[in-house]
Every structure is written in structure tokens, then in C-alpha cells.
Amino acid sequence: MYFINILTLLIPILIAMAFLTLVERKILGYMQLRKGPNIVGPYGILQPFADAMKLFMKEPMRPLTTSMSLFIIAPTLSLTLALSLWIPLPMPHPLINLNLGMLFILATSSLSVYSILWSGWASNSKYSLFGALRAVAQTISYEVTMAIILLSVLLMSGSFSLQMLITTQEHIWLLIPAWPMAMMWYISTLAETNRAPFDLTEGESELVSGFNVEYAAGPFALFFMAEYTNIILMNALTSIVFLGPLYHINYPELYSTSFMTETLLLSTTFLWIRASYPRFRYDQLMHLLWKNFLPLTLAFCMWYISLPIFLAGIPPYT
């Protein structure tokens, strides 16, 4: 029974991830005044499945100088972590109801750094290694602000549980009292998932393709799947943290509908940003975080700690 529960969670996520690639290509196409994929199936709707078949049927290339075990483990670990992040997410009922759900998501997302670093090192190519080092520095840096923003938000809800966050937002979205945090959080999620304008790891002009330059066929597809799964997850998390979906104990479908709509809109904004903005320079990327976001988030964190103390208030805690 538990295995069926896991499948009913993972299969829709993988299907959503497949269609997100199609939506991205369609949006980029229409924003560049062209059609995008429209050959495979009606309106190109079967394109993701054709891509998956092509990638997994190709022979996986392995350069002679690579470290074989790490070369294969890295993409597998990447996708495994991306899928395991969904475990504590309420939809409206999580797979495992963790009291420290938010901490689990933070800790597991930090582990994805290892898969990037291993893939860059195991490829035994200087371009891969440079791409991996950039990705690791960027991911670790932006995780600092994400953790502080989450801490500030959790001070308002009073619990690390994601269910509690939704209960807190029954009357008002946390987006309204904490909108500067929400803006910084959204930009940090863009950087965390290595998306434009922060896709420095894939700088085509200088790094060919980044840490996955030596990968082809199946292992490359695993990295690709992990990236898009993470995009959906980050937007789902943004939806829960700042735009608490409607929750009524007797109407679970109401929650699912509002949750899906918010996640879809946020994901579309990700793609819209990709089509609109040029890439940042690497030093600007780091300045934005360490000189702008970090002092601001620390100041907000102090504010959210001191406010309930001054007003002798306590957060809603169950």
C-alpha cells in the first residue's frame, strides 16, 4: 500500500516535469515570435515523451578518463534528491507528515550540491569542474538567504510543519506582511535552481555547457529531469510559504486546485523571466547576495523576532 502511495506521488510529478519542458519551449517560442514544438502529436503535446525515448535509447557515452562510479552516481543522486524533497509537501496530505518538514526540505536541497560537485569532478574536464565550482558556490551562497527568510516566516507561523504554515494563512497570505522577503525568496529560488538570469553554470560562451558537459543520453536526461523537478518543487514551496492555498477539511480538492494554480503561475513566471532577462555577471550575482540580500534578510529576521516580544504576542502553535 505504501509503495502505491509513493507511485501516486512520483508519477504525476514526473509527468508535470515532462510537460514543463514543453511549456517552456512553447513560451520561449511565442515570445520570440515563432511556434515552438508543433510536429509530434497535436500542438506538439507528445514532444516530451519523444525526447525522453530518444535520450534513454541512445548509447550513454563515457569518456575514458572519467571516474566511472561517481560519473553514474551523480545524476542518479540528483534526481533521487529532487524527488525525495516532495515527501513532506502537503497536497493536501503529505506522504509523511513530518513535524520538521521545512528543515527536511532545507537539508535535502543542500545535498544536491554533492551531485553537482561529483559530476564536475568525475568528468575529468576543466570546463565541467569550473561549471561545478560555480554552481556549488552559487547554490551554497543563496541557501544562506533562503534559510534566513524561512526562519523569519516560521517565526510568524510558530512551527516547522508545512501544515501549520497553511493554517497560519487561513485569514491572510504571508505575502502581504512579508512582501520584501517574498521578493528576495523568489529571486533566491531562481538562483538556487540555476535558472536564467542566474544560469552562470551553463555559460555557453565560456563553459560550453557547465558541469554536465561530458554527459549524454540517459545520465544527461537525469540531470535535466532533476532541474525541472526542482523548479516545480521550489514554486510549490513558494506557494505554501507565501500564498497559503485554500484549505478546508471537508473539501480537499479545493486545496489541490488552488495549490496547483499558484504553482503553475509561479512556474510560468520562471519561464517568462528566462525569456526576458540577460544573464548576470558572476561578480554581480555574488554582490547581490552578500551585499544586498544577506544584510536585508538579517535585519528582517531581527524585526520578526523582536515584534512578537514587544507586543507580548505568540504565534499560532498547535
From Swiss-Prot:
Record keywords, A-Z: Electron transport, Membrane, Mitochondrion, Mitochondrion inner membrane, NAD, Respiratory chain, Translocase, Transmembrane, Transmembrane helix, Transport, Ubiquinone
Main location as per UniProt: mitochondrion
Name listed for the protein in its UniProt record: NADH-ubiquinone oxidoreductase chain 1
Top EC class, one word: translocase
Any one GO molecular function term: NADH dehydrogenase (ubiquinone) activity
Similarity annotation: Belongs to the complex I subunit 1 family.
Reaction catalysis annotation: a ubiquinone + NADH + 5 H(+)(in) = a ubiquinol + NAD(+) + 4 H(+)(out)
Species the sequence originates in: Rattus norvegicus
Enzyme Commission (EC) number: 7.1.1.2
PROSITE patterns: COMPLEX1_ND1_1 (PS00667), COMPLEX1_ND1_2 (PS00668)
Keyword Lipid biosynthesis (UniProt): no
GO cellular component, as recorded: dendrite; mitochondrial inner membrane; mitochondrial membrane; neuronal cell body; respiratory chain complex I
Residues annotated as transmembrane: 3-23, 70-90, 100-120, 146-166, 171-191, 231-251, 254-273, 294-314
Assembly, per entry: Core subunit of respiratory chain NADH dehydrogenase (Complex I) which is composed of 45 different subunits.
Gene Ontology biological process terms, A to Z: aerobic respiration; mitochondrial electron transport, NADH to ubiquinone; mitochondrial respiratory chain complex I assembly; response to hydroperoxide; response to hypoxia; response to xenobiotic stimulus
Primary role: Core subunit of the mitochondrial membrane respiratory chain NADH dehydrogenase (Complex I) which catalyzes electron transfer from NADH through the respiratory chain, using ubiquinone as an electron acceptor. Essential for the catalytic activity and assembly of complex I.
Membrane topology type: Multi-pass membrane protein
